[in-house]
Amino acid sequence: MNRFVYITEYLPKRYSASPEQDNARRMCWDFKKGILSDRVRDAFISKVRAIQNDSGKRCMVCFIPASTKEKTILRFSRLSSALKTEGFDVEEHAVFNTSDREAEHINGKSDNPTRTFGFNESKIRERIIILIDDIFTRGRTFNQTAAKLKEMGAIDVIGLFLAKTVNPDYHQADRGSNVINSEYEPDVEVIYLDDMEFEMEYNQYPIYNPDEEYMAEDLDQFDPDFEDLDCYDDNPENELY
């Protein structure tokens, strides 16, 4: 079972959002476009430091590639530089694009979304890896990438995401609880951010509670290129998920 940390929550566009949830959406859209706010940068730095301290060993930071090399560089280059400045071990070439792939919401879902990823075994072996990406929904790409890293000798792989998708339809609202319907439980374990305590996701549902209002550029008409599987559902309109 793979573990992951996330910083905030992403509510899909089809749901009416509070001002705080709308701010979180815009923060995610900005990050997709390569905009790294001070708030997001500092949150990633804090979580990488917490994971490394919890592991008791020096970790290596890697990134899950986007659909193209260009998008991977755009999305993660500023964060990579910020983490290096803080003294973390960041390796952009441990997991990398071997070729560009068409976005899965255009071309259909692949049985193996990592088919266009390359892995540098010499950089992976005997390392604890913090694997960063933007949004976690079902976790298929993360789990398959983590499995490949472990196959190549990684000691452990811990995911770190800017946001986790929340979907009110999948909660047992009739019970008045925050228990996630077992049908939609991903094969992961959440590391909660407050104290790094390991809890199963269905035992506690974290509520988004931002410390400050997030102001982004005017993105009211922006339809972000959420090209990866974890941002889409199966509907024909390709609504953000």
Regions found by a protein language model. Name each.
Residues 63-67, 162-163:
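Short loop/turn motifs enriched for small/polar and acidic residues
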Residues 65-75:
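Glycine-rich phosphate-binding loops at beta-strand->alpha-helix junctions
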Residues 1-60, 95-125, 165:
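Active-site-facing substrate-recognition patch
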Residues 58, 87-90, 154-156:
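A generic structural signal for alpha->beta connector loops
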Residues 60-65, 130-131:
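Acidic beta-strand-to-loop metal/phosphate-binding motif
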Residues 93, 97-204, 238:
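PRPP/pyrophosphate-binding module of the type I phosphoribosyltransferase fold
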Residues 74-90:
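Glycine-rich phosphate-binding loop and adjoining helix at the ATP-binding site
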Residues 188-241:
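DE-rich, low-complexity intrinsically disordered acidic tracts
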